[in-house]
Amino acid sequence: MAIDLPPVIPPQASTAERIEQYAALHSENIVDVNIGDYTLKISGNRYLSREQLDMIMSAAQSPAQAVSALNQAYYQLGHLLVTVYFAQRENTIFAHVINGKLAAVKAPDNIYPYFSTLIGDKDLQKSEFGSKQVLANLKSDRAGLDYAVSYQVGGDPEAYTLVFTEKPKADYDSTDLDFSVNNFGNRFLGRYFGNASLKHDFKSGVEALFSYDRALTELGEVNGGDYYDGYTFRLNYPSSFGLYGLEARYIEYARDADVSLTGDVGGDAGGNSTGLCTLALICDVSEALLGLDLNGLGSGTPLFPSPDGTNTTLNLYSETKSIAFSGEQVISSDSFQRLTTSQRLEKIDSYIEVKDYGLALDEPHTSLELGVKYTKVMRLFGFGTQLTAQGLLEAGLEADAGTLGTDSREGVVATGRRTGEFLIFKPRGGLKMAVADWASVKWDVISQYSDNKQLPLQQQFFLGGGSGLSAYLPGVLVGDSGLYTKLALESNGLPFAGLNFTPVVFVEYGQAWYEDAAGSAGDVRAIADAGFSVKLELGKTFETELIAATPMYDDNLDEKSLSALEVDFFWRLKLNF
């Protein structure tokens, strides 16, 4: 850790006369406790009840143990600036508790603002220090600095100064260059992808990241894809008020889609159309994977004029641009719990264009997301456990434009029925329990619930591939609302031929549905699978992972379409420099 937690202040030797004099002026009552042949007189106590004192003293075998246990109890309860002064007169031990206040902070300029707001605190708690420590740690790590924390006390025994001593961090590396390849696929096209990312930490605490994603169409299984390029730029800074950042993304791809239409091409994409779309791996779940209504747009207008039974190839081009401002604040933090709040304001402009037709999807929208997250470390059923609970609420702020809100039909799922004026609740939770020295049980839940509105493409809930449900390609389940849960038994890491070997077995369940849809279009579609993963790591330099799963259950899904999206395994390889 870049910044140490302030150490426990050891008991301080004094004289019986001085303690008696000080206790007479600063203590309302004195507690007498018998320890063997000795009487321990405790004065100045503010934070321990008589029951707590009796419990602490009952475990002590000697006066020295009693004084040490009393001193340690205050620290364990989170009171950092409490000191026990002690002295002995024959068979009487005097113990006076000094409840200090933070009078000053001595620290280098780059971290002083993080802790200066604590000055004047008359009962400095671990959680108060910890809430400042989290952000200061982040900045110090990025700057390559460590800090040791100590105390200074002057003439006033109740006035403490926190002193931060700086030293360079050993083996500091401010830049990471990563290259990775995988076959996780993408919701819209392709199976094989490559990524290159560059991250640099500045001495000021600013972190900058640039990432490039590319579909490796040369390796096959392109799923109709021509190319896919994605660019991400991220910048953030841990100020004394919170972690604030900027993120910009740009994605473009092109693909061909072979379509055969018969009968009425003016139907909807909610399962009520008489049109027949035969795009391999796509059209049976066309709304899910392409994000648009291949059979119609708006109130049933065909995407393109086509005689009955004509085979046509659609040339699709898609572009998505987004910019987001984010913030996260630490409300409370110590060794056992942390409470944070977050905000994210995002502007997204996304469209899909069909050659010789024009825009088939145009979804500009702005959203504000507010969140709260709580993490706690505890013992549950005798096992060390970490619990996480998070709630996010996202609201669409922009009036409908483009293709949003252009379809007045009721009960169908269609591109024009989506709206940018939405409200989404995203509860999430997690549990990690150390059931053995070598293994942990993990349970994670991710969900999303829309307020009976059909959502823009970029806000939809989808599963498959790296997003969960590892027996299928990305986009096997898509909806406005949904839920995903995973239960896993995970190794804590085992040595293997100089590598760190992490095997995992798991079961997964996911469901998704479209809102405000009638009939089968609004059905809850569900999938469950079970599988394993194996990860090998060589420090930070090399990492590879294999994931394989087999289907266990499905509901309200076409078996032919589902089997077309089934995969044998996923893998990824990552190198770090």
Predicted regions and their residues:
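Residues that define the transmembrane beta-barrel architecture of outer-membrane proteins
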Residues: 158, 190-194, 227-231, 319-323, ...
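Post-signal-peptide, soluble extracytosolic/periplasmic N-terminal scaffold domains
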Residues: 1-170
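Outer-membrane beta-barrel initiation region
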Residues: 63, 83, 103-241, 273, ...
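Outer-membrane beta-barrel "beta-signal"
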Residues: 536, 541, 563-577
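C-terminal outer-membrane beta-barrel translocator/porin domains of Gram-negative envelope proteins
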Residues: 353-501, 505-509, 513-515, 520, ...
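Outer-membrane beta-barrel translocator domains and adjoining extracellular loop/strand segments
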Residues: 189, 220-230, 256-267, 272-276, ...
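Transmembrane beta-barrel strands of outer-membrane/channel proteins
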Residues: 149-151, 177-183, 196, 208-214, ...
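Short loop/turn motifs that connect adjacent beta-strands in outer-membrane beta-barrel proteins
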Residues: 170-174, 203-207, 238-245, 332-340, ...
